[in-house]
Amino acid sequence: MTAFAPVWAVGLMTGTVLDGNVDIALIRTDGETVQAFGPWTLAPYPAGIRPLLQLALDAARAWAFEGPEPPVFAEAEAALTRAQSAAVQAFLASAPAATLGITPSVIGFHGQTVLHRAPTAGQHGATRQLGDGALMASLLGIPVVHDFRSADVRAGGQGAPLSACYHAALLRGAAPGTAVLNLGGVGNLTWMGPDGAGPGGMGPGRAGPGRAGPEQVSPDTALIAFDTGPANAPVNDWVEQHTGGAMDRDGALASAGRVDEARLARLLRHPYFTAPPPKSLDRFGFTAAMADGLSLQDGAATLTAFAAAAVGRALDVLPHRPARLAVCGGGRRNPALMDALRCRTGAEILPAEDLGWRGDAIEAECFAFLAVRTLRGLPISFPGTTGVPAAVVGGVLNTPNPAARPKEGFAN
């Protein structure tokens, strides 16, 4: 493979929990390893963006990939793209990025997932992220890679999770027996076997043809990733419905409640948890309605325990159960969830920072990393991560067109 000099890349990520922010991170990478970690930030959206995105999410659920897209998609996509473009411009113009004189070669723009449908035996998968890569490239004058998931879905994959490729690069420096658990709206797990070469041109291995049983994957698979189940989304929605708050801050409500173990056992009988990976979920695949009839505190406790127990079930299907989980994403800041993971997985639970990683920046770093892989023509999804039949080079590259720069600039 021709040598590729590492470049600076910006990654942008907004999660399905709609916290009103965009994560922005800079890394220097060749798409296989990370040479340097640059600055990162959490940039709040202007007023009005979050409610508009919520309208788009609500419209997406009613649309369900049937018929024309809801009109609110175009409005929300333009507003989100301009808001994130303005955030990137401010980020690059401020210290330390400006002080270091960093000029990115590419931006990885994930956009906002409004609907995701995993493929089933009788139905093709589908996915929709709001984000206009061509508009962002024109506004910033920097190449932009967006629409990372569609190519995988068209090829028969789940379209998620895509973070495995980057997690594998991070795991190269971790102790054996470590897996990565990301806790956003949905949880996802990345496991790399002892023969995993990491994300080179074809590093993560092809899924083995045989399995020991319907609940286990082949031990010769080098890289496995899948969604474990719900994470923060149901409990966040539960708290918002009952208090107007955005989340169970510090797990205070869950800590004050009692888990309904009988209900939890019923929830864990859902067929998703016995299906072999690769598999993926939409943010609304499991909802706060699972706790209906419980008190505020008991509902929070039960939904939190469900998220942790789902991870425990996920570990059961791996070829080798990991000794420890490096946890990234917002869920690692919830002490009740972290304690529940320790209780219900049997693994050592460590925040990503204990491994020297930046837990709040990992998802944004991931899309910077994937953007560089797209530039190089390297795959970003694999049979063991999304179930796609063969590795797929995903993402759409948009090059700047100064003549097409909108006169209104960053204004909505």
Annotate each predicted stretch with a short phrase:
Residues 4-10:
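Extreme N-terminal starter segment of soluble prokaryotic enzymes
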